[in-house]
Amino acid sequence: GYHPSNSLVLVAIKEGTVSMAMRVDYPVAENTDAYDLLAHHIKLDGADSALMIAYVPTEANQPYESGAEVLGYLAISLLKNQIQIRESIEVIADRWRSVICEDISCCPPEGNELPDFESSRVAAEQVMHGRTLPFIDVTELADSIAPLPNIGSEFIAQVESYFVHEDATDLNEKQRDGATAVVDLGQLYEAGRGNSDPDLVAQVIGRLSDIQVRDYALGIHSEETLDAYWAMWKELLRIAPVGYVAPIASIFAAVAYESGQGALAHKALDRALIDNPGYSLALLLRRVFSAGWPASAFIQMREQLHPKVKAAI
């Protein structure tokens, strides 16, 4: 993710473990429906408690309500849904305070200085597990999946040579070839060899022009191989030529959403829809993500679908 600002963040907790996090723009005025919708989303995820954080805007010329007021409105909606409040935090500039802590020696009215995240234990654990630290802002987040410059014409020609025409006489053969290529490339990433075979990379990108190959690729990863496929789809997304981005961006969006990276998932869908504004899978995923489907429900749906796609190929 990225360091939020001018935001309201809601972290769902299920059986003592963080299950999902949601961020919305900081409310300009009271909107009961918006707070109820946030509470409803984490209720669907099975949350029994929540952590709320209000990153209060500092612009003096805007009619923003105080962090305490915004957190109070959200707390009412959560309690209506039988979700307990674990913590409620207001962040203004570089200071924070708990609005439910009554000990002024712990949480003075002026707040406490925010700790340096990059030198924290949490940051160290993230790096040790091979995960990137949160980006500075949403622009930097989007830049992390932006197209790389100077994609060579030879590579583009390679990709185009693997394009699958829907009326091809050997369509099923090319679909099987594409599915096999996805598996082979995934195994390279699992082995830590990444994109060491440029022709195989081009083959996967080109074959994903076929919907059956794309749907097969959408369901191929497991919990154990998620990190390898995350890296694979992210790298392919950045080097895919124009016209070949939408399938990969949609797959990466699904993987990001399953990993709890909702903001990144939406940015990936932005790339898909820039490449192909009417791309049906990207439009469907946008509706699913915006509706707040729990990642667990999305995973279950994908796992049920994959055997049928595999049988069709």
Region annotations inferred by a language model:
Residues 1-13:
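N-terminal basic/disordered segments at the start of proteins
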Residues 3-5, 19-313:
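Charged, compositionally biased boundary regions
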